[in-house]
Amino acid sequence: MANTLNLGNGNWATKEDSLLAYNSENGNYKPLPFDFTRASSATVVNKDGLIETVGSGEARIDFSNDAKGALLLEPSRSNYIPYSTLDFDGGVKPNGWSIGFGIGSYSYEQLTYKGQKAVKQTQITTGRSYLDTGSITILANTEHTLKIQFILNECVADANDNILSFISFGAFAIYKFSDIDSNGVLEIQFNPLSDNVGSLRIGLGVDQNATGSKSLAWAIPQLEQGSYATSYIPTSGSAVTRVADICNNAGNEQVINSTEGVLYAEISALANDGTERYV
């Protein structure tokens, strides 16, 4: 039987605190002695490309990179942006965010991206506006990563348009539309050396007027402590922590013959950051 069991390879089944293996010989699933734990909910990209939330203790099968899927195991992280869900709740802007300047004719509207709420700013006439997170407190002298997904087919902007600024955090930094990669991702690593309190401003008018008929659309903003970005953590009023995924007790005599056997695994690291990894 061991030669016919596949964990993954496009065939996944999960239940609370465990994974199931697919038996390609008879087309059903068999339990394996994997112990899986995570004491919090978490998000994952499903087969339809949508970001969905799974409950505490439920293994995450992520389809971000291909149709086969992969078991996603991540360290504990927190999203320090207090209102990342960008919910307008019938208003004219996302809850918890403030509009800065507000010069000229402009609008903000609710969009949807990968099953999550998004925001689109339109600068109708020449003027200036942006969305501000409000005060955020993070740990000084520690590397952090900011990741924002821009919806490129909804954006009308020039490469040199300024779209993001850090206020305080020990330094004033501005990023341009050209800093977004071809997939619409803006990912920034930074280290607040002195001041651990600041805010983020996102929009076409973060530091100067923008010409009319331009737009900027974005979603799932996340600011976390660490040298690389992890899966999205929704927040609605305060920072939220996702607890680490833990999966162990694999490859024992219940799966492999007690005297010999081979365990084959395809594994991809979340980041090449020099930390130790064990299989």
Feature map (PLM): residue ranges:
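Extracellular and organelle-lumenal recognition/adhesion modules and their flexible linkers in secreted
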Residues: 1-279
